């Protein structure tokens, strides 16, 4: 049996230097994101979202990035889910992208806000019909006795709305407004490259190198 402690990989694909990155971290993220797409990284927009409840208990789960602009990173979910309740109590959150094929990670820290109703409507109506009905059928994070209950709810809403369900009031988008963004590039001997962008009071960004 393979020892877990003996599982390791030495990284040597690329390097990362302050002289080579964009002064704006959102543009730098887009550069890396596009490279990950070209490299055919699976689920390139999958990201870990970390939140904290009022008692300080952290939670993490995978969600999907659905928009990126000069304001930040947008994802969509059920506002009444555990993460929605945690974000309502404490809007500070973190994201992590891990593109293992490129030996890269991106960590994002900031404050989360709800996107506009129009943004939530536009994305909701772009989704496949099954996903739109699922947003009605699933009381996300609540206990259900079995899968049949979910399927019955989905059938009920399909009968009720047909192929034109409206967006549920409990479902919509969030945008994480970044305050810090770290780009991590794996390097040999665990001497990885880490560059962190820190938002300044004037809205600009300061870049520092961190020890691995």
Curated annotation (Swiss-Prot):
- Amino-acid positions noted as binding substrate in the UniProt annotation, renumbered to this chain: 8-11, 66, 123, 127, 131, 190-192
Assembly notes:
Homodimer.
Give the pathway: Cofactor metabolism; pyridoxal 5'-phosphate salvage; pyridoxal 5'-phosphate from pyridoxamine 5'-phosphate: step 1/1; Cofactor metabolism; pyridoxal 5'-phosphate salvage; pyridoxal 5'-phosphate from pyridoxine 5'-phosphate: step 1/1
Q: Which reaction does it catalyse?
A: pyridoxamine 5'-phosphate + O2 + H2O = pyridoxal 5'-phosphate + H2O2 + NH4(+); pyridoxine 5'-phosphate + O2 = pyridoxal 5'-phosphate + H2O2
BP GO terms, sorted: pyridoxine biosynthetic process
The answer, when asked if DNA damage is one of the entry's keywords, is: no
Q: Which cofactor does it need?
A: FMN
Q: Which organism is it from?
A: Ralstonia nicotianae (strain ATCC BAA-1114 / GMI1000) (Ralstonia solanacearum)
Q: Which residues bind FMN?
A: 61-66, 76-77, 83, 105, 140-141, 184, 194
**Function of the molecule:** Catalyzes the oxidation of either pyridoxine 5'-phosphate (PNP) or pyridoxamine 5'-phosphate (PMP) into pyridoxal 5'-phosphate (PLP).
Task: State the superkingdom.
Answer: Bacteria
What's an example of a GO molecular-function annotation for this chain? pyridoxamine phosphate oxidase activity
Alphabetically sorted, this entry's keywords are:
Flavoprotein, FMN, Oxidoreductase, Pyridoxine biosynthesis
UniProt EC number: 1.4.3.5
Question: What is stated as this protein's family in its record?
Answer: Belongs to the pyridoxamine 5'-phosphate oxidase family.
What is the cofactor note? Answer: Binds 1 FMN per subunit.
> Entry's PANTHER family?
PYRIDOXINE-5'-PHOSPHATE OXIDASE, PYRIDOXINE-5-PHOSPHATE OXIDASE
SUPFAM superfamilies, A to Z: FMN-binding split barrel
Q: Does the keyword Transmembrane apply?
A: no
Q: Could you identify this protein by its name? A: Pyridoxine/pyridoxamine 5'-phosphate oxidase 1
């Amino acid at each position: 049996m393979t020892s877990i402690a003996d599982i390791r990989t030495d990284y040597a694909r690329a390097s990362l230097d302050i002289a080579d990155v964009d002064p704006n971290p959102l543009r730098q993220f887009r550069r890396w994101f596009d490279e990950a797409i070209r490299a055919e990284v699976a689920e390139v927009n999958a990201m870990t979202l970390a939140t904290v409840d009022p008692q300080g208990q952290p939670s993490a789960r995978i969600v999907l990035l659905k928009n990126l602009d000069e304001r930040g990173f947008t994802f969509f979910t059920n506002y009444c889910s555990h993460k929605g309740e945690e974000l309502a109590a404490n809007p500070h959150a973190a994201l992590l992208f891990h593109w293992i094929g490129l030996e890269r990670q991106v960590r994002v820290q900031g404050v989360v806000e709800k996107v506009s109703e129009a943004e939530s409507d536009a994305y909701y109506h772009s989704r496949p019909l099954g996903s739109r009905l699922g947003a009605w059928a699933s009381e996300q994070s609540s206990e259900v006795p079995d899968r049949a209950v979910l399927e019955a709810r989905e059938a009920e809403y399909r009968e009720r709305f047909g192929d034109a369900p409206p967006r549920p009031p409990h479902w919509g988008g969030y945008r994480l407004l970044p305050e810090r963004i770290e780009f991590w590039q794996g390097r040999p001997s665990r001497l990885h490259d880490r560059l962190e962008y820190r938002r300044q009071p004037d809205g600009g960004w300061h870049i520092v190198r961190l020890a691995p």
